A protein has these predicted regions:
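Walker A/P-loop NTP-binding active-site region of P-loop NTPases
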Residues: 164-217, 271
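P-loop NTPase nucleotide-binding/switch module
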Residues: 88-90, 97, 101-104, 117-168, ...
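Loop/turn-to-beta-strand initiation segments
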Residues: 199-201, 228-231, 262-266, 337-342
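Nucleotide-state-sensitive switch-loop elements of NTP-binding domains
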Residues: 200, 210-254, 284-296, 303-308, ...
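Acidic-enriched and Gly/Ser
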Residues: 2-17, 23-26, 32-150
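Phosphate-interacting basic helix/loop segments used at nucleotide- and nucleic-acid interfaces
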Residues: 13-24, 152-157, 251, 306, ...
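Conserved catalytic/coupling modules of large nucleotide/cofactor-utilizing molecular machines
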Residues: 274, 281-527
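Phosphate-binding/switch loop-helix module in NTP-utilizing enzymes
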Residues: 243-279, 331-332
Length: 527
């Protein structure tokens, strides 16, 4: 052979290849499945696992660490237990349970892991923020007092139990009393803010509901044009208990994504009674000690740490940027002045608000809207018992015109209920009592509102002005609602400036005289 192999060249090539070899070995920390049952697995060998860390099984199923014991780790599965057997290998991911969030989620239905479940394809998560499911609530220094109203579009709520941005207002009542209807109407009412370029992003969390119920709700939101600013997080009754337990945390994490970037967000938890039941199920299978009604001892902490994440963030940029427990991905993107409002829903049994979970959540929230089946059956809908419903934020979450007009409405209605109880025993009454009773009955009629028809705040103030000042005294009780519709039709078409002025928070003698003149004309046709 003419070409001789030169040893020096061979050694040079080998040397170059050896220098390019990476000496770092890749280690995976793994454990083995000891036991698996009812959506919970025990794993041996993961001695460095952290609480709330994601684990991966051989078949790709994910799990979250909940129990850290001396010789094993208890984790809850976020999928089916089929295909998981004793002795299988489980891998640490070194990631704390989180959800990837971006604006492409708006209008979609997702599960608590952030995966689309609405059959419309995967969500483009390019540039998404990794938001932790469980996160410490903002400290006092990073918060601001609640003073901006969150308009629900419901006369009874906006006038007597006002909700502010950053507040936590509980909706409580028996089944079939219209709890979800109040929350859905509130979401639909945010449409005008979205169209005006000042969106309130809404997150509806469905916990343990039927898939058909969630589908009907999505269809309703779509029909009323509320989907473009709404995200639905759903863990249906068919999903594992762990998914139902983590669904509200996923909703809160999505809400924080908007809140920390300076936007207003609203999250509805429907309902937390089912989350508590799911948590009880998981805890008992993990053999945690049980307490009252077999709930684990930390069920209060479960709801308090979830609801404390609702807040109005300080408007000062330099303060907001220093917020505690800020995710790494959010640094540099924080804007002050954002808010997260929470509307948790609790279902009571036979009106018993003194049960364990209802009293817990009542004590955590900033007020409650109490719905009664008796009122619902009598046709007063929304069936709000104004006597025991309260908002601890009060008038500071109302615009000035609403505060001025509806300031006495709650006391007036309380006085009416008291007199009504006495009037059943007495046939003769003085003129003042008769007038108070008449006005109270008519105000009750004015506060009735059909579902899916939230009312703009300017129109609410105009009609409530008529009720509070007794401008309908000559209208028969059965014609009050017709009179209201005719009045609103007239004021919308002929005097839109009155509605605009009231909505801006102003009310003066000219506006009052204008309302009185219109109602006088309309009431005359019904008298």
């Amino acid at each position: 052979m003419s070409d001789k192999i030169k040893p020096s060249e061979v050694s040079e090539v080998l040397l170059q290849q050896l220098q390019g070899i990476s000496q770092s070995a890749k280690f995976d920390e793994v454990g083995t499945v000891l036991q698996v049952s009812d959506g919970v697995a025990r794993i041996y060998g993961l001695r460095n696992a952290e609480a709330n860390e994601l684990l991966e099984f051989e078949n790709g199923t994910m799990a979250i660490v909940m129990n850290l014991e001396e010789d094993n780790v208890g984790c809850v599965l976020l999928g089916s237990t089929s295909g998981i057997k004793e002795g299988q290998v489980v891998k640490r991911t070194h990631r704390i349970a989180s959800i990837r969030v971006n604006d492409n989620m708006l209008g979609r239905v997702i599960n608590p892991l952030g995966q689309a479940i609405d059959g419309m394809g995967d969500i483009d998560l390019k540039g998404a923020f990794e938001m932790p499911l469980d996160r410490k609530a903002p400290g006092v220094i990073f918060r601001q007092s609640v003073k901006e109203p969150l308009q629900t579009g419901l006369k009874a709520v906006d006038s007597m139990i006002p909700i502010g941005r950053g507040q936590r207002e509980l909706i409580i009542g028996d089944r079939q009393t219209g709890k979800t209807a109040i929350a859905v109407d509130t979401i639909i009412n945010q449409k005008s803010f979205y169209e005006a370029g000042k969106p309130v992003y809404c997150i509806y969390v469905a916990i343990g509901q039927k898939a058909s119920t969630v589908a009907a709700l999505v269809q309703n939101l779509k029909e009323h044009g509320a989907l473009p600013y709404t995200i639905i997080v759903s863990a249906t009754a068919a999903d594992p208990a762990a998914m139902q337990y983590y669904a509200p945390f996923a909703g809160a994490a999505i809400g924080e994504y908007f809140r920390d970037r300076g936007y207003a967000a609203l999250v509805v938890y429907d309902d937390l009674s089912k989350q508590a039941v799911a948590y009880r199920e998981v805890s008992l299978i993990l053999r945690r000690p049980s307490g009252r009604e077999a709930y684990p001892g930390d069920v209060f902490y479960l709801h308090s740490r979830l609801l404390e994440r609702a807040a109005k963030i300080n408007e000062q940029q330099e303060v907001a940027e220093q917020m505690n427990d800020l995710p790494e991905c959010m640094k540099g993107h924080v804007r002050g002045g954002g808010s997260l409002t929470a509307l948790p829903i609790i279902e009571t049994q036979a009106g018993d608000v003194s049960a364990y979970i209802p009293t817990n959540v009542i004590s955590i929230t900033d007020g409650q809207i109490y719905l009664e089946s008796d009122l619902f059956n009598q046709g007063f809908r929304p069936a709000i018992n104004v006597g025991i419903s309260v908002s601890r934020v009060g008038g500071s979450a109302q615009i000035k015109s609403m505060k001025k007009v509806a300031g006495t409405l709650k006391i007036d209605q309380a006085q009416y209920r008291e007199l009504e109880a006495f009037s059943k025993f007495s046939s003769d009454m003085d003129a003042v009592t008769a007038m108070t009773l008449d006005r109270g009955r008519k105000n009750n009629q004015l506060l009735i509102q059909p579902q899916y028809s939230p009312m703009p705040v300017g129109e609410q103030i105009a009609i409530l002005y008529c009720g509070v000042h007794g401008l309908m005294r000559n209208v028969p009780i059965d014609k009050v609602r017709e009179c209201q519709d005719a009045f609103l039709e007239k004021i919308r078409s002929a005097h839109p400036e009155i509605i605009e002025t009231l909505a801006s928070g102003k009310i003066d003698n000219d506006i009052s005289n204008g309302i009185e003149a219109i109602m006088q004309d309309i009431a005359g046709t019904f008298a």
